[in-house]
Curated annotation (Swiss-Prot):
Industrial or biotech use: The availability of a complete eukaryotic luciferin biosynthesis pathway provides several applications in biomedicine and bioengineering.
Key words, A-Z: FAD, Flavoprotein, Membrane, Monooxygenase, Oxidoreductase, Transmembrane, Transmembrane helix
Membrane topology designation: Single-pass membrane protein
Gene source species: Neonothopanus nambi
Gene name linked to the record: h3h
UniProt cross-references to InterPro entries, sorted A to Z: FAD-bd (IPR002938), FAD-dep_Monooxygenase_BioMet (IPR050493), FAD/NAD-bd_sf (IPR036188)
Similarity-based family: Belongs to the paxM FAD-dependent monooxygenase family.
Cofactor names: FAD
Class of this enzyme: oxidoreductase
Protein name per its UniProtKB record: Hispidin-3-hydroxylase
Recorded GO MF terms: FAD binding; monooxygenase activity
Regions crossing the membrane: 6-26
Reaction catalysed by this enzyme: hispidin + NADH + O2 + H(+) = 3-hydroxyhispidin + NAD(+) + H2O; hispidin + NADPH + O2 + H(+) = 3-hydroxyhispidin + NADP(+) + H2O
Any one annotated GO CC term: membrane
Length: 422
């Protein structure tokens, strides 16, 4: 593949949030990036998304205009009981001072649009990435660094990035074996409601009108036992996004279906919703009554992988470490992957150096992403760990006080110093 002088040719599989972030990070280093995605982007997924301080910092480092995200400041996490009681509150008004950026809530489509803009903008830093839709990968030759698509065509590159999500195709070729993403037993109803639809109901003013403004987590008691001895893990997460004009709702619970035969994402009815959350306080049930276009979404976790890298092919984001959404760090970890990859492959990096740099990328990213995934899992499954993220400043500092750009630059400096002294 032809490449610009002192530039690598990069092929990214997946034009989701992680793939676009990787494209931005690599184009900013002067590399020539092509993005391939199996979809046509005719039906983008509408849902809210958490952007904690470490994630917002990384977006700024990639040159994103955060004003375009239409974010809503998450000033407080409020834990509430399913009976209507108010429990612990975690004040987040000092996050900007503590971490350099605030925590915001955004609409996924707004975030995707901004990443797309920065990746493809001809006026941006470095050559603009190019996007190729309706290209589904069927095969990746790791030795030749090529991919083959369903239309029979093959593309080669100096570097291939598998950012193709939790159902990744590239993962199988990196690991040289199939990896099963097991059923978690956890599922969530999710939907969006226009904020002004709440106006006729004063009992819902607490969601977007009354302080403290921020996300609400409405849970059943932490240690009740059901008839089969399983903890009741039902939780409803509510927050505003898109400049406060929309409210995102995610209602998490144990899945009664066989997840191995059920589709990962299916439409659901209001009757389905009330059957699970029928005993929640009337103030919450009123919100459930406003639900429309409900989707039932399986939450699966990619098991710890033996490696993320094989020669000049690497994994990034959910393809490597998809996790539960309990810490709001799923996208953030993929974004950190992208920033690290771009930092470790500056302009002037040669194709012969890629394998060494990717090994360093894996060393830098794998433990942290797996730690966050494990913490996210325990917050959902271990009763005494529920709410730990809100209670533990040490844990929050470890997760949100981390600056991937700074850490990547340190690693690169050490690597270059070692190479120069050899």
């Amino acid at each position: 593949m032809a490449s610009f002088e002192n530039s690598l040719s990069v092929l990214i599989v997946g034009a989701g949030l992680g793939g676009l972030a990787a494209a931005i990070a690599l184009r900013r280093q002067g590399h020539v990036v092509k993005i391939y995605d199996s979809s046509s982007f005719k039906a983008e997924l509408g849902a809210g998304l958490a952007v904690p301080p470490n994630t917002l910092r990384s977006l700024q480092q990639l040159g994103c205009n955060t004003e375009n995200l239409n974010g809503v400041d998450n000033l407080c996490f409020t834990a509430m009981g399913y009976d209507g009681s108010v429990g612990m509150m975690n004040n987040m008004t000092d996050y900007r001072e503590a971490y350099g950026t605030s925590w915001i809530m955004v609409h996924r489509v707004d975030l995707h649009n901004e990443l797309m803009r920065v990746a493809l903008d001809p006026g941006g830093l470095g050559p603009p990435a190019t996007l190729h839709l309706n290209h589904r990968v069927t095969f990746c030759d790791v030795d030749a660094c090529t991919v083959t698509f369903t239309n029979g065509t093959t593309q080669s590159a100096d570097l291939i990035v598998g950012a193709d999500g939790i159902r990744s195709t590239i993962r199988r070729f990196v690991l040289e074996e199939d990896v099963t993403v097991p059923a978690s037993g956890i599922v969530g109803f999710r939907w969006l409601v226009q904020a002004d639809a709440l106006d006729p109901y004063p009992e819902l003013d607490w969601i977007v009108k009354k302080p403290p403004l921020g996300a609400r987590l409405i849970s059943t008691p932490q240690n009740p036992q059901s008839g089969v001895g399983l903890a009741d893990r039902r939780t409803i997460i509510i927050y505003a996004c898109r400049g406060g004009t929309m409210v995102n709702v995610l209602a998490v619970h144990d899945d009664e279906r066989d997840q191995n035969t059920a589709d990962w994402s299916v439409p659901a009815s209001k009757d389905d919703l009330f059957r699970v959350f029928h005993d929640y306080h009337p103030r919450f049930r009123r919100l459930l009554e406003l639900a429309q276009d409900i989707n039932l979404w399986q939450m699966r976790v990619v098991p710890v992988l033996k490696k993320w890298v094989n020669k000049r092919v690497c994994l990034l984001g959910d393809a490597a470490h998809a996790s539960l959404p309990t810490l709001g760090q799923g996208f953030g970890m993929g974004l950190e992957d992208a920033v690290a990859l771009g930092t470790l492959l500056p302009k002037g990096t040669t194709a012969s150096q890629i394998e060494t740099r990717l090994a360093v990328y894996e060393q830098l990213r794998k433990d942290r992403a797996e730690f966050v995934a494990a913490e996210s899992y325990e917050e959902q499954y271990v009763p005494e760990m529920r709410g730990l993220y809100l209670r533990s400043k040490e844990l929050r500092d470890r997760v949100m006080g981390y600056d991937i750009k700074v850490e990547s630059e340190k690693v690169l400096e050490t690597l270059l110093r070692s190479s120069n002294s050899a």
